[in-house]
């Protein structure tokens, strides 16, 4: 039995990291019956439905957001809500319910959760409408040295290497200062 569970968990991990894809809605639904509480699988399923132009994607993103909140993963829940609300505009009651859920419970990403929970409902809603979920392929450069600072990035999944540069003297050569790995929830 343990061998079967290990294989299933390995498959789920590979689906989540993108090394295995399922393009069949029916097969994905079968997988969700086995793993009904995995928020990442629900998010990927919602993305598949959205790609298929199914309005059911909104419900799937909502379910994923709920599971992310229950798992203490605020940022992932917010991204799911952004996708859901782009399909169907939420009512004021739905916005308030989501805002309240962000402010409750223990969270793995305390800093991000406190950032959003510290906002009023209208502030959080206004901020969320400005957020644009983006995917970057592995190895791509998000921002080049010298680019104008005009965006705020949140790492929702995966990892990012941040490299800071500075000049040794005014007008002198640029020297590499340091690198720092940013992971999800940074």
Residue map of PLM features:
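TPR-repeat structural position
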Residues: 18-22, 54-55, 74
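Helix-turn-helix repeat elements of alpha-solenoid scaffolds
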Residues: 15-25, 39
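Structural register within alpha-helical repeat arrays
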Residues: 7-11, 27-31, 44-45, 57, ...
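Helix-start (N-cap) detector for alpha-helical repeat units in TPR-like alpha-solenoids
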Residues: 4-5, 39, 58
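Short coil turns that delineate tetratricopeptide repeat
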Residues: 36, 69-72, 89
């Amino acid at each position: 039995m343990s061998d079967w569970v290990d294989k299933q968990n390995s498959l789920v991990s590979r689906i989540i990291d993108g090394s295995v894809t399922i393009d069949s809605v029916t097969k994905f639904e079968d997988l969700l019956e086995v793993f009904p509480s995995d928020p990442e699988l629900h998010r990927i399923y919602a993305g598949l439905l959205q790609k298929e132009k199914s309005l059911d994607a909104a419900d799937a993103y909502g379910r994923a957001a709920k599971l992310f909140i229950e798992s203490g993963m605020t940022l992932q829940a917010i991204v799911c809500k952004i996708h859901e609300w782009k399909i169907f505009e939420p009512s004021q009651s739905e916005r308030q319910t989501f805002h309240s859920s962000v402010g409750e419970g223990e969270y793995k990403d305390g800093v991000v959760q406190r950032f959003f929970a510290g906002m009023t409902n209208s502030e959080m809603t206004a901020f969320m409408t400005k957020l644009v979920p983006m995917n970057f392929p592995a190895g791509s450069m998000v921002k080049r040295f010298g680019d104008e600072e005009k965006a705020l990035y949140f790492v929702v999944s995966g990892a990012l290497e941040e490299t800071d540069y500075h000049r040794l003297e005014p007008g002198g050569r640029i020297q590499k200062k340091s690198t720092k790995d940013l992971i999800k929830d940074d």
